[in-house]
Amino acid sequence: MIVNVIGAGLAGSEVAYNLGKRGIRVRLFEMRPKKMTEVHKTGYFAELVCSNSLKSEDITNAEGLLKAEMKLMGSITLEAAEKARVPSGKALAVDRNIFAKEVTEAIESLESVEVIREEVTEFDPEEGLWVVATGPATSDGLFSFLRNLLGDDFLFFFDAVSPIVTFESIDMEHAFWGDRFGKGKDYINCPLTDGEYEELWKALVEAEVIEMEDFDRKLLFERCQPIEEIARSGKDALRYGPLRPTGLVDPRTGKEPYAVVQLRREDKEGRFYSLVGFQTRLKWNEQKRVLRKIPCLRNAEIVRYGVMHRNVYINSPKLLDIFFRLKKQPNIFFAGQITGVEGYMESAASGIYVAYNVYRILKGLSPLKLPEETMMGALFSYIIEKVEGDLKPMYANFGLLPPLKTRVKDKFGKRKKLAERAIEAMRKFLEEYPW
């Protein structure tokens, strides 16, 4: 049987790669570059449209634990990320183009995967096995088809991305290199005095934004709040939030600045840097004006402006079973952010999980839940089985895991034990039920 995968984002790429490398025939549909979305820039698979950071690799961080589990199951996302890595302190950050190119080439090299560069606006639900992994920027044509198939069980939220500037346009006379608490020198830090901070805050509060249809502040995703919305919540909100100076010492003064705008490398050559936590929906001319309030960015060349977009996802607890299959048509799977998981790694992990169970089904075996002691198992169980009311997008966090049998007072020690238990549970599971 051929597995039809719609969408070559992180989740769809994991499905296609993990099945294709095991000899399963896959047809992977991707409409880009023939038809682009409002947030994508290339035709590569697994293009990262928000941040270039894949977050922590430390297992005492929920994102790090998730990666450790994904490595055990096998992940093209993490294989490509290693080849595209750029310096970013304790976080795993990548050169977007190298990363997406690595994923694309790995999938296109598989003989059992046929890549079809066409938009899918409909398909026969009765024919074959389908995996819908079109992400939050699902095209209007397919969205209409899915709405007819699923009913009105669609939800949405808004998120935004940050501007990117060229390194050569950053005035390093007004900036310094360093990570928090002296743990590296991978970030460019733009210190602000109290007067400069107030000027920036006022500019953000007063700036004009791009109006969006159906926009509702209650639907802003918490990890991608536009910086102007944070600014409007209070004068000090930014310097206790994305512009906090904690652990950053300006070598010119020997002190922590009043506030700091951090810049993170976007590419291996270090030509481009993004503003950390500076997601925005300001009009483009306003973004220019606001950035000029930051001393080291007074002459910055903006190569990508911040934008906001609406993300669509389905009401998974109502529509899907624990294996991410449609309850009423179990030959149709969903994977990625369209299911309500939030985050790059979470999306990729859901693709691995779907691929694992599709593989089992095609081999005549029953699909399996992952252990709830694992971050992957706990996240997917939450999305499908434990939500009360409408689903809100959920990302990996230690609060999803069942408690330890013995109490550990120290937060770090507790997370370490939870992580060790999760990794051991995943190892045992894969030993008993391998691909």
UniProtKB/Swiss-Prot annotation:
Cellular component annotations (GO), alphabetically ordered: cytosol
Cofactor: FAD
Gene Ontology molecular function terms on file: flavin adenine dinucleotide binding; tRNA (uracil(54)-C5)-methyltransferase activity, 5,10-methylenetetrahydrofolate-dependent
UniProt catalytic activity: uridine(54) in tRNA + (6R)-5,10-methylene-5,6,7,8-tetrahydrofolate + NADH + H(+) = 5-methyluridine(54) in tRNA + (6S)-5,6,7,8-tetrahydrofolate + NAD(+); uridine(54) in tRNA + (6R)-5,10-methylene-5,6,7,8-tetrahydrofolate + NADPH + H(+) = 5-methyluridine(54) in tRNA + (6S)-5,6,7,8-tetrahydrofolate + NADP(+)
SUPFAM superfamilies named in the record: FAD/NAD(P)-binding domain (SSF51905)
Location relative to the cell: Cytoplasm
Endpoints of the signal sequence: none
Annotated EC: 2.1.1.74
Superkingdom per UniProt: Bacteria
Residues that bind FAD: G7, A8, G9, L10, A11, G12
Enzyme class: transferase
Keywords tagged on the record: Cytoplasm, FAD, Flavoprotein, Methyltransferase, NAD, NADP, Transferase, tRNA processing
UniProt cross-references to InterPro entries, sorted A to Z: FAD/NAD-bd_sf (IPR036188), MnmG-rel (IPR002218), MnmG_N (IPR040131), TrmFO (IPR004417)
Biological process (GO), any one: tRNA wobble uridine modification
One Pfam family recorded for the sequence: GIDA
Family: Belongs to the MnmG family. TrmFO subfamily.
PANTHER family: GLUCOSE INHIBITED DIVISION PROTEIN A, METHYLENETETRAHYDROFOLATE--TRNA-(URACIL-5-)-METHYLTRANSFERASE TRMFO
Function, as annotated: Catalyzes the folate-dependent formation of 5-methyl-uridine at position 54 (M-5-U54) in all tRNAs.
Protein name: Methylenetetrahydrofolate--tRNA-(uracil-5-)-methyltransferase TrmFO
Species whose genome carries this gene: Thermotoga petrophila (strain ATCC BAA-488 / DSM 13995 / JCM 10881 / RKU-1)
